[in-house]
Amino acid sequence: MQNTAKKATLPATALAALGVVFGDIGTSPLYALKESFHAAHGLGIQPENVLGILSIIFWCLMLIISIKYVAIVMRADNNGEGGIMALLALNLRKAKIADNKKIYMIAIGFIGASLFFGDGIITPAISVLSAVEGLSIATDVFDPFIMPIAIAIIVTLFLVQKHGTAFVGKFFGPITLVWFLSLGILGIHSVIQTPVVLGMFSPHWAIQFIYHHPIMTFFVMGAVVLTVTGGEALYADMGHFGPVPIRLAWFFVVLPCLVLNYAGQGALLLRDPAAIENPFYLLVPQWALYPMIIMATMATVIASQAVISGVFSLARQAIQLGYLPRLSIKHTSESEEGQIYVPFLNWLLLIAIIILILIFKTSSNLASAYGLAVTLTMLCDTILVAVFIYSAWKWSLPKVLLLIIPFFILESVLVGATSLKILSGGWVPLLIGAIAVTILMTWKRGRELTFAKLEHDTLSLDLFVKSIGNSVHWVPGDAVFMTGTPNVVPHAMLHNIKHNKVLHQRNILVTVVIEDVPFVAPEERITTETLAEHFFRIKIFYGFKDEMNVPKALMQAYEQLGLEYDLMHISFFISRDRIVHSVGDGMSPWREKLFISMQRNTSPVSDFYQIPTNRVVELGSQIEI
């Protein structure tokens, strides 16, 4: 776990968590209840329907967020880290599953991660649009400008990503706290006028609604799920803040304020059914409308920022675990390691969000696209947590099923309900998810084939070291060969002998190994091995959230080997592999073409491992897969 939670006091850390963890779920009141009474449902705004839907919302928040995520899922941490990639890595390490069966668990993890990438596109679009749409409540004059204003805010948000959010991020927590308190105050003011709405806390209203409207309930659940969007963030951001501050913020600020606001909107509908046009903004007094629109816009920008940062972080984890090709990653803060910027993803997200806004035009239309991504991600989490509880906690299978099946059934119903909206927008997360899963699976399989080919076709390192003798000319200096296959001779070394007819006095084979843990302790970073007089093998171990700096790690390795370290006398030899198609078993031709394209466009190894470019010698090689 990072040190944020350790250094700051508990209330301060809980305040910081508000701005990062709860931005997404905190903006749901802008549109969730309105969508539950969408005209397409044909549901009348009678008191029993209002109380029934409010009761379903309350119990979904309690069951999915308070019990599933806060009480159960957040205990399934990978050395303090959460998130679907961390959970997948943990299960791959702990679960006693045959290798040929692990592919199913990897597929579930990849689906969940891919849908989160889709969430990174949909969340900024729907949240910013819903905030700006408040202007149309004030006056019709703004109607033609809703989309341009939303797009302008989104573009500005993405333009500042390269500068980082270290400074403005300090204000995210306080602003979000004011936002939640505003939600609560608005709700209380309305509930006092119509206290009968407090009946929503009784589950009998939810049961009665389901009994009288079984088919309608299925449609309504597709909108109710919008109230729990962002639940995964509680788990994903656990490594940064720690579980206790997140739980504290949820139970003492977020949950009460959300419930009060939904109750307040419901009370307004009981008094004035016509308020369904926009129950959130119509809850606001006329004098406070513009300040609330500004506050809502800030809250949605903060929520969007949290999701964007989450996408960047997830991408880095996937890259370091070997599930994505290397991308250029920039660090935007000298003090906070987790603050990163991925240029390629930044512009890809921006373009996708603008296209989404132009296609769907309103937050109401986008709601159809949103729910399916959320429910499928939650279902993936549930399955992976079940595996974790069974394998790591050693619970019996009946006990695991007794705990998990209620959540599995509820979330399966939510998936089914949101699936009804595939044609009206649900296709968006499915398309994004399918593309992302294809990329993840293709890259993983392609790398496996590449390494297998290298292991099979290349000379054994031990045999090479024993046979080299004095048959080559030795030149002064150190040659570091970066290799992913430490037991065979690197292509770069063979090409160096072939073209230059020399070897250096010290030849050091360096392999970077990514462990299934977020961070590796400094004392466990390095293993060294002396193979012969001129040959050494070094393995550098990193966690999937560690910052990788090979020259810095080499300094530690040299010290272990008793060698003098001088970066200016070290040449880094890197093989630039050119992958080509070959006849035989492997991947289908279209996947091979996709893999080859990704391989050609990866970020340079020297940039990724922070190796000075003036110390790099790159030699090309061809590999058939």
Curated annotation (Swiss-Prot):
InterPro entries: K+_transporter, K_trans_C, K_trans_N, Kup. One of its GO terms (molecular function) is potassium ion transmembrane transporter activity. Keywords: Cell inner membrane, Cell membrane, Ion transport, Membrane, Potassium, Potassium transport, Symport, Transmembrane, Transmembrane helix, Transport. One of its GO terms (cellular component) is plasma membrane. Its main location: membrane. The keyword Transmembrane applies. The keyword Metal-binding does not apply. It is a multi-pass membrane protein. It catalyses: K(+)(in) + H(+)(in) = K(+)(out) + H(+)(out). It is found in: Cell inner membrane. It comes from the Bacteria. The chain crosses the membrane at residues 13-33, 53-73, 103-123, 141-161, 172-192, 206-226, 250-270, 282-302, 340-360, 369-389, 400-420, 422-442. Belongs to the HAK/KUP transporter (TC 2.A.72) family. Transport of potassium into the cell. Likely operates as a K(+):H(+) symporter. This is Probable potassium transport system protein Kup. It comes from Acinetobacter baumannii (strain ATCC 17978 / DSM 105126 / CIP 53.77 / LMG 1025 / NCDC KC755 / 5377).
